[in-house]
Amino acid sequence: MSKAREIRTKIASIKNTQKITRAMELVAASKMRKAQDRMAMSRPYASKIRKVISHVAASHAEYPHPYLQQRENIKRVGYIIVTTDRGLCGGLNVNLFRTAIADMKKWQADNIGMDLCVIGRKGEAFFRRYGGNVLAVADHLGDAPEVQDIIGIVKVMLDQYDKQQIDAIYIATNEFVNTMVQKPLVRQLLPLKTDEEEVEGGYWDYIYEPDESKDLLEMLLVRYIESQVYQAVIENIACEQSARMVAMKNATENAGQLIDELRLIYNKARQAGITQEIAEIVAGAAAVE
């Protein structure tokens, strides 16, 4: 019967764990919906500001802004890596690291150096071990970060670009496809390619003064980069909560299956114990007779 008591203890322990994973699943589902709402609200801003940049740049083509010009000799590139602060979100970070490293190896093959700015504690820990040149880290952003929280890390990378210490900037993040699918990707932030189709397809009857258009374009480009990084951060949060919800759901279901298996083992052990006791009683009665 001692074995049966051990099994009962295991069942009770797993039930407690199951309650925790179920609660975490519900919390993650709630946070995911909020993150999706923030993600949807920020997209129109980034889309509109890119259109404005395309028109302003086209109206003042004689002023080639450095953020819009492809550099011929690329000697060093920068990466902004967007990860999570916490774990328990499946293979979200691991898949992103694998994608980012695969992209970085293309530059390494050409002996091109790399600088990193990392968002999230998981990314910081990984690239400290991996050996990347981490310039800046932003962590503890929470579940509802503001644009101000990422301005510092963006400025570090833009300063490097302005000083020509790096010749291109890329961002590695997770794209939210749906609740079950999160896609790791790497895309180029700078130099920015203007939307030529948007310029040709629409006509804005605006007159830009040369000096003012330069200042406007400078401000818009910086704001656009900030908005892209912020969009990546909140989209990564939606991916994190979605992956955590799925992981906790699977953990809850696995706990239920394990409890069922242990109950079956417990019932068999209890039945064997009762059978043994009956056999001992019968044997004792027979000995008395």
UniProtKB/Swiss-Prot annotation:
> One biological process GO term for this chain?
proton motive force-driven plasma membrane ATP synthesis
Query: Is the keyword Transport in the record?
Result: yes
Keyword hit for Transport: yes
Q: Where does the protein principally reside?
A: membrane
Query: Highest taxon of the source?
Result: Bacteria
SUPFAM superfamilies under this entry?
ATP synthase (F1-ATPase), gamma subunit (SSF52943)
Membrane topology for this entry? Peripheral membrane protein
Q: Which GO terms describe its cellular component?
A: plasma membrane; proton-transporting ATP synthase complex
- Give this protein's Gene Ontology molecular function annotations: ATP binding; proton-transporting ATP synthase activity, rotational mechanism
Subcellular location per the Swiss-Prot or TrEMBL entry: Cell inner membrane
Please give the PANTHER family that the UniProt record associates with this protein.
ATP SYNTHASE GAMMA CHAIN (PTHR11693), ATP SYNTHASE SUBUNIT GAMMA, MITOCHONDRIAL (PTHR11693:SF22)
What NCBIfam families is this protein classified in?
A: ATPsyn_F1gamma, PRK05621.1-1
Assembly with partners or alone: F-type ATPases have 2 components, CF(1) - the catalytic core - and CF(0) - the membrane proton channel. CF(1) has five subunits: alpha(3), beta(3), gamma(1), delta(1), epsilon(1). CF(0) has three main subunits: a, b and c.
By sequence similarity, the record places it as follows: Belongs to the ATPase gamma chain family.
Q: State the name under which the record lists this protein.
A: ATP synthase gamma chain
Q: Which organism is it from?
A: Coxiella burnetii (strain CbuG_Q212) (Coxiella burnetii (strain Q212))
Q: Which gene encodes it?
A: atpG
